[in-house]
Amino acid sequence: MNDFIKLAPIKKIQGTIHLPGSKSISNRALLLAAQATGTTQLTNLLDSDDVRCMLDALRNLGVSYCLSNNRKTCEINGIGGPIQSKNNNQLILSLGNAGTVMRPLIAALSVQTQNIVLTGHPRMKDRPIAHLVDALRQGGARIEYMERNGYPPIRLYGGYYGGEIFIKGSISSQFLSSVLMMTPLAYRDTLIKVDGALVSRPYIDITLSLMKIFGINIQHDNYRVFYCKGNMAYQSPGDYLVEGDASSASYFLAASAIRGGTVRVIGVGRNSKQGDIYFANILESMGAKIAWGDNYIECTRGADLNAVDLDVNNIPDAAMTLAITALFSINGPTILRNIYNWRVKESDRLAAMATELRKIGAEIVEGYDYLQITPPFKIESAYINTYDDHRIAMCFSLVALSDVSIIINNPKCTDKTFPDFFTQLSSISVLQ
């Protein structure tokens, strides 16, 4: 198999995309269902590397489930409480580069007494977890760094009981989400106080919404203080439909705004809890035409696209798609602000995007927490490194909407969240 894909110039985009399930929702729902009382059937589950990591980890921890042949429906038999390893000896779980598995499991496995090592891909060992570990230790958790302080791999001994804890919100919302999902299963109540700015707040809304579906309602004071009752139990909702991935929708909506035609993405709509649906509003402000339904978003190319200057902290994944969309704007630089957390994702996305955008001719200013993109007079064909990062691969595929081809290395990295991305893109593309 080739370790690259060459995308020919695309003349027009037109069609309908059925979105894969949301990665963030899939892995949260799996973890909550595993700890709930009763059996839960999840449908439209994402079939991807990250979700397989969560499923493998849960099986190794003694959770039983039945997965359909297409891996999109999963029936989970909840254990009715916090997860505890059935292995009396040390258990080692390797979690790839899946932050939506590593961070929540650190918290979930900090309640019961056990001896579990969590490790993963080399890049995972560069992704910080100190803010999460510090918060859990305040509540009694015994956690040991095995190599570098502040980073995986780690050893978990359990011991979290509750109390008042402080957690920093400036690096990743996954830290707060992970603690929130664990606290109902602790022995005592937990009062969580957020220290500093809270990034990617819509992901907290996803977490709180899912917890409510599983029977736990968390009160908070403007996202600064969270009041979490302990000694509670999650209750299975029975059936739960995982909505489509709004981050994945961004590529197809942007493609339509650039080279439409009309594209309809099915699986998310006006009532979605995912912050990345706001990307459609940004496209509209840039000149695209947007229509909303309960279960779809539709984009039609309108006027030439305008540049934007935005704080995109609440949509960190879809904001990457904006960086590529900016190449096709007509009136000056686009500036994406408050994106430091790009640096601690699957790659240092800020540095990676700057490097690869320069290859195709864009004038780039890379700041500590911002990116300024001035479109080139003519986009140049290039060989794009993806840094084993699915979102970089999918973003740069949109360069083919110009009049040049683009070569994407390691296209299989999209297996992390969207295994058939290139097939789906091809299905709505008319080549030049």
UniProtKB/Swiss-Prot annotation:
3-phosphoshikimate binds at residues 23-24, 28, 172-174, 200, 317, 341, 345. Coiled coil: none annotated. GO terms for biological process: amino acid biosynthetic process; aromatic amino acid family biosynthetic process; chorismate biosynthetic process. It is found in: Cytoplasm. Catalyzes the transfer of the enolpyruvyl moiety of phosphoenolpyruvate (PEP) to the 5-hydroxyl of shikimate-3-phosphate (S3P) to produce enolpyruvyl shikimate-3-phosphate and inorganic phosphate. NCBIfam families: aroA. This is 3-phosphoshikimate 1-carboxyvinyltransferase. It comes from Blochmanniella pennsylvanica (strain BPEN). The lineage of its organism: Bacteria, Pseudomonadati, Pseudomonadota, Gammaproteobacteria, Enterobacterales.
